[in-house]
Amino acid sequence: MALPKYKTSRANTHSRRANWKAKAAQTVTCPNCGAPTLPHMACPSCGSFRGRVYREAVRSIHTK
């Protein structure tokens, strides 16, 4: 396995990591209630997704 021949300076390290940042999550508005939701996910406030209501399935309690 190859090893670095020289130590990477702080300036090179910081300049390389300058563009390494997190993006803001992209949201869409729920057509049912208007709340912001993640795309392709059920709405957390009303529980609907693509015309169906999935709130009961999300809040169900599984027992053994």
Swiss-Prot record:
Name the domain of life this protein comes from. Bacteria
Species in which this protein is naturally found:
Bifidobacterium adolescentis (strain ATCC 15703 / DSM 20083 / NCTC 11814 / E194a)
For biological process, the GO terms are: translation
What's the short name of a Pfam family annotated to this entry? Answer: Ribosomal_L32p
Q: Spell out the SUPFAM superfamilies in the cross-references.
A: Zn-binding ribosomal proteins
Q: Name one GO molecular function term.
A: structural constituent of ribosome
- Which PANTHER family does the record match to this protein? 50S RIBOSOMAL PROTEIN L32 (PTHR35534), LARGE RIBOSOMAL SUBUNIT PROTEIN BL32 (PTHR35534:SF1)
**Entry's family note:** Belongs to the bacterial ribosomal protein bL32 family.
Q: Gene behind this chain?
A: rpmF
Q: What is this protein called?
A: Large ribosomal subunit protein bL32
List, alphabetically, the GO terms of the cellular component aspect: large ribosomal subunit
